[in-house]
């Protein structure tokens, strides 16, 4: 992201999900003001060790799970969900959801927003865009032939999970992508985030009664 030239002229809002520095410094000092500033200006003070890290998901003072991405906090609040009062199990999804989700930048001030108001399924989010609730949203890109503004779903993993049988069963992103491990009698959460197919014993077979070969196939 820092070195690509394929998308020139981007704003500071592009950095919202690239590390908690954006919240811990920029947002706490000036709210969403950073979002409309030039990308390079916002990125310049951030050092290599201040991007993704422990504080992306954990409060640096208490190490408890936290959600720092304010676009997600605001969008969930419009659904009457206070993420700061969420259960520990819900937080095991929200820490991922704050960035792994559909989003857009508002026309007024460039802030990050999420189209959750009508629901989390694809049809409800599309309705949100259609009904003019999207804060000046005009489209993600223009079709080169028709010159029509088009909608591009970014990466709606949160919505895909939230409307799944896994969510209904209380299984979160962390259960599958960062499963519990044991070492020397100690139980811990793996922080090697990857496909559950790489940890079928720990991630899948605790719930599924099929064989490992069947699950992988």
Features from the language model and the residues they span:
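Primarily the internal scaffold of c-type cytochrome electron-transfer domains
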Residues: 1, 27-56, 61-175, 179-217
């Amino acid at each position: 992201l820092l070195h690509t030239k394929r998308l020139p002229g981007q704003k500071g809002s592009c950095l919202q999900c690239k590390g908690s520095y954006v919240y811990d410094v920029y947002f706490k000092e000036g709210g969403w003001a950073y979002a409309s500033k030039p990308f390079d200006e916002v990125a310049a003070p951030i050092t290599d060790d201040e991007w993704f890290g422990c504080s992306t998901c954990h409060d640096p003072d208490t190490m408890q799970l936290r959600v720092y991405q304010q676009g997600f906090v605001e969008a969930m609040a419009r659904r009457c969900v206070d993420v700061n009062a969420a259960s520990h199990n819900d937080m095991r999804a929200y820490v991922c959801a704050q960035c792994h989700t559909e989003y857009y930048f508002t026309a007024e001030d460039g802030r990050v927003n999420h189209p959750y108001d009508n629901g989390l399924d694809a049809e409800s989010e599309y309705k949100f865009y259609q009904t003019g609730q999207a804060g000046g949203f005009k489209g993600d890109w223009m079709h080169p032939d028709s010159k029509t503004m088009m909608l591009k779903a970014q990466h709606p993993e949160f919505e895909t999970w939230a409307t799944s049988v896994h969510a209904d069963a209380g299984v979160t992103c962390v259960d599958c992508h960062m499963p519990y491990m044991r070492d020397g009698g100690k139980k811990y959460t793996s922080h090697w985030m990857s496909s559950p197919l790489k940890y079928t014993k720990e991630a899948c077979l605790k719930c599924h009664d099929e064989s490992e070969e069947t699950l992988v196939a």
